[in-house]
């Protein structure tokens, strides 16, 4: 992969800590994620041609084991799609500051056409998404 993509307006990121239970050589890994909720969306400027992988996780309530969520994606102001994810609670990852549990990550791939493009990510306006907090991070990939 070639790099992490940051938002257009350089918003603060949430730290998520992952403890590698089965791999003692890696120890604890801290990654930075952008927050999506009912009031908060994220916009990214991406230059193509490129391939981008969008990782996502949902914040879990303590009594949940499984959760579903939807992410709505727009490319240059045009609806690209609503993506559905089903996930389970992570036993290794949590939000660093609050110690709240998050899900295992899920992902989708976007093929970015030639030129400069703007991508908006938000939670889909569905009853099932009410009250959800989702975290995303984008990685750009290039062919070798």
Where do the PLM segments sit?
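Beta-strand-rich ligand-recognition modules
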Residues: 1-3, 75-140
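Glycan-recognition and processing domains
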Residues: 1-49, 57-62, 84, 89-100, ...
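N-terminal hydrophobic or amphipathic segments with adjacent small-residue motifs
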Residues: 31-34, 71, 109
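Residue-level marker for the onset of beta-strands and adjacent loop->beta junctions
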Residues: 40-42, 69, 106-108
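Extracellular Ig-like/FN3 beta-sandwich strand-entry sites
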Residues: 49, 66, 114-118
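Short coil-to-beta strand junction motifs in C2/discoidin
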Residues: 63-72
């Amino acid at each position: 992969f070639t790099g992490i993509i940051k938002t257009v307006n350089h918003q603060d990121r949430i730290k998520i800590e992952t403890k590698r239970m089965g791999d003692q050589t890696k120890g604890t890994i801290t990654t930075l994620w952008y927050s999506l909720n009912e009031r908060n969306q994220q916009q990214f400027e991406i230059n193509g041609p490129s391939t981008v992988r969008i990782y996502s996780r949902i914040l879990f309530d303590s009594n949940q084991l499984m959760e579903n969520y939807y992410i709505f994606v727009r490319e240059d102001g045009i609806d690209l799609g609503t993506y559905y994810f089903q996930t389970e609670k992570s036993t290794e990852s949590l939000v660093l500051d609050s110690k709240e549990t998050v899900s295992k990550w899920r992902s989708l791939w976007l093929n970015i056409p030639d030129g400069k493009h703007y991508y908006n990510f938000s939670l889909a306006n569905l009853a099932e998404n009410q009250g959800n907090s989702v975290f995303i991070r984008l990685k750009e990939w290039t062919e070798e």
